[in-house]
Design a protein with these regions (language model features):
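Acidic/polar-rich alpha-helix caps and helix-coil junctions
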Residues: 1-119, 157-294
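Short, cationic low-complexity segments
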Residues: 122-144
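Extended polysaccharide-engagement surfaces of secreted carbohydrate-active enzymes
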Residues: 127, 153, 169
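Residue-level signal for threonine
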Residues: 48, 149-150
Length: 294
């Protein structure tokens, strides 16, 4: 029996939680959950076999268990997930942008709500409200949060199609007919990726755009990382190239004949650009040298 002398519970070790809770739970979910095709339309947004496999791949990658991470990435791929033809197809409030072929786990939102931040019936997304250029009138709300830095913007390679679909900068394509000016933010930039125009969300609490928590591009980059860390650097080119090709970076020579260290840097760069502002960066940096990578 447990002693009652010390009433303060002690903290379990990290590895105990991983090995006895997180991994068994996700393994069981992978074995028992339906695939996305087995769900009805009414069940869209529920966790699937693919979601469990993708999350388990992240866990194994974090622990440096690369063979098992690769196994789970392959499991996701075998379930039929694919990249959307266009990067911007992954984001937006239109029905065509929701639960796409690339989406593995997606938080569902509903724009018809009367409640504010604290309302229990509030089912709208707030990303567009928070990230729209401050006081621009381009989106409902527009607080101007999460402004990209110059250092981040400089990471885009010439010809990368994702730049114009991720950030607003002076000279970028207009947003709903509106020209962006550098004076609209402190850094000269705002996030574009999650913005929903007034025509689709007229107020700050009416945004129906979903949020993709896990998508296939992430899995492909995890697969590339696992292969490279296993010493299979040439094989890592394949999933990496798939992601870069959609972004318009079609010169295969840019990622060929690299050392393991060079490929590692390429993959890390690609994750930063492909998954920008989607909530993965902090976890990636912790995984890479306990945050020293930053």
């Amino acid at each position: 029996k447990e002693s009652l002398t010390n009433k303060t519970p002690f903290r379990q070790s990290k590895m105990k939680i991983y090995n006895e809770v997180i991994i068994p739970d996700l393994r069981e979910a992978f074995n028992l959950l339906p695939t996305r095709e087995q769900y009805s339309n009414a069940d869209k947004g529920r966790a699937t076999k693919g979601a469990a496999a993708g999350m388990l791949a992240k866990v194994y990658l974090t622990l440096g268990r690369y063979s098992e991470a690769l196994e789970m990435c392959n499991a996701v791929e075998n379930l039929g997930y694919t990249l959307n033809p266009d990067y911007s197809d992954c984001f937006g409030a239109a029905e065509r942008n929701k639960n796409t072929a690339e989406s593995i786990f997606e938080i569902q939102y509903y724009g018809l709500t009367k409640d504010d931040f604290w309302g229990e019936e509030n089912q709208a997304s707030w990303l567009s409200t928070f990230m729209g250029p401050r006081n621009s009138g381009w989106v409902g709300g527009a607080y101007g949060w999460n402004q990209p830095t110059q250092e981040f913007v400089d990471q885009y390679e010439a010809g990368d199609l994702r730049k114009d679909k991720t950030i607003l900068y002076e000279g970028c394509p207009n947003f709903e007919g509106n020209a962006y000016r550098a004076s609209m933010s402190n850094t000269g930039y705002n996030v574009r990726k999650f913005l929903v125009p007034l025509s689709q969300s007229p107020d700050f609490n009416t945004n129906p755009a979903n949020f993709v928590a896990l998508r296939f591009a992430d899995v492909l980059l995890m697969k590339a990382e696992a292969l490279n860390e296993l010493g299979r650097t040439t094989e890592a080119e394949v999933p990496l190239y798939k992601v870069r090709t959609r972004a318009g970076l079609t010169n295969r020579a840019d990622i060929e004949n690299l050392t393991q260290t060079q490929m590692r840097e390429k993959i890390r760069h690609e994750r930063r650009i492909e998954l920008a502002f989607e909530g993965h960066r902090w976890f990636d940096m912790i995984r890479w040298d306990n945050g020293q990578y930053a």
